[in-house]
Amino acid sequence: GGSANSVSNTAIISGSNYIGGLFGNADFSTTTSLYNTGDVAGSKFVGGIIGYNKEGVTSSAYSTGSVDGDSLVGLMIGYNYNTTMADYYYLEQGALEPFGENNGGGVATPKTASEMKTEDFAELVGEDFVYDSGLNDGYPVLSWEVE
C-alpha cells in the first residue's frame, strides 16, 4: 500500500499482466486526482486507471483512452475488490465496461466526450482539476499542469 495524488498519463502503456494507465497494482493504496488519456494494452488485469485494485481508497478520476486485453479488462479498473470509490468517470466506448470484475465498492459513471470537455466536468471530477480548451485535447487537466 501507499498513496498517490495528482497523477496523469497521456502516453501509450503496454505490457502483460497488472497493467494500468497509471497503476498496475494498487492494493491497500489511497489514490486521488487521477486521469489517463493514453491507450492501455495487456493480457490480464488491465485498466485505464488501475490494473488490479484491492481494499484501497480511490477518488476523483477519469479515463478516456482505449483499453485492450484478454482477461479482467476494464475502462477504469481491470480487477476491483472491496475498494472505497468516489467520483470515477470514463469515456463511453462501446460494450467495454468500467470494470473487468468488480467485487464490491466500485462505481463509475459513463460520459460522452462533449460532456467531459467542459468546465462543469472539471469541477465534477474533483477540486484538483481545471479546464483549459487549449490543453489535453480539451479534457480537464490537473491544476499543477497549468501553473
Functional labels for PLM-detected ranges:
Residues 1-147:
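Predominantly extracellular beta-rich ligand-binding scaffolds that present long acidic/polar faces
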